[in-house]
Design a protein with these regions (language model features):
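Short, conserved glycine- and acidic-residue-centered signature motifs
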Residues: 87, 109, 113, 164
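Conserved acetyl-CoA-binding loop-helix of GNAT-fold acetyltransferases
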Residues: 105-119, 138-146
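A short coil/beta-turn micro-motif at the C-terminal edge
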Residues: 14, 135-137, 165
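Conserved GNAT acetyl-CoA-binding A-motif
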Residues: 122-132
Length: 190
């Protein structure tokens, strides 16, 4: 488990699939995740996650974001993970989603992100972490910049949603920048 001040990041378990299914079928949540909304059956979700709940492919790995509870289990509110881990060049792309609307804009995503970056830089010894965010997602852009990500470039008209194309902003943070900004973040905790 990885702990932030507000959040805990943990392995996805079978009982978490109901929350994931709810988020995948929430048109607004998926819009901000930059995924075209389509209804996903519970069977499709079970097939997508069933075999790999606690397994990592080595190049991709997903964790659940929960509210931090000192005793017991917190509320499931989102997911975070890396994709295309490149160990040779020491970088990866990450993505996160707060699926529970009651937690949007309240700092839970930023808290989970900072805790996860601590893990990626300290435990996986990465040099750079990067992400893509659609230009219309101003709340996410502000949050990523406040967490120390800089804008590296733009994939013009990269994502097609709701009948139109949107630019995708490429952002990254380097290990040295993270350590300077967050010297207090120990591996796996905050």
């Amino acid at each position: 488990m990885i702990h932030g001040q507000l959040t805990t990041l943990r392995a996805i378990e079978r009982e978490d699939l109901d929350a994931l299914w709810r988020w995948y079928n929430d048109a607004e949540a998926m819009y901000y995740w930059a995924e075209p909304h389509k209804t996903m059956s519970r069977e499709d979700l079970d097939g997508r996650y069933g075999a790999g709940l606690s397994a990592s492919t080595g190049r991709a790995h997903w964790l659940l974001i929960t509210t931090r509870e000192e005793a017991g289990r917190g509320e499931t509110i989102g997911r975070i993970g890396y994709v295309d881990l490149d160990r040779r060049n020491r970088h990866t792309e990450i993505a996160l989603m707060i699926g529970e609307r009651d937690y949007w804009g309240r700092g839970y995503g930023s808290d989970a992100l900072i805790a996860y970056l601590g893990y990626l830089f300290h435990e996986l010894n990465l040099h750079k972490v990067w992400l893509r965010v659609e230009a219309f997602n101003e709340r996410a852009l502000r949050a990523y910049e406040q967490c120390g990500f800089g804008r590296d470039g733009v994939f013009r008209e990269h994502t097609f949603l709701g009948g139109r194309y949107y630019d995708s902003i490429i952002m990254s943070i380097l290990e040295d920048d993270f350590r300077e900004r967050y010297p207090f973040v120990a591996p796996g905790t905050r």
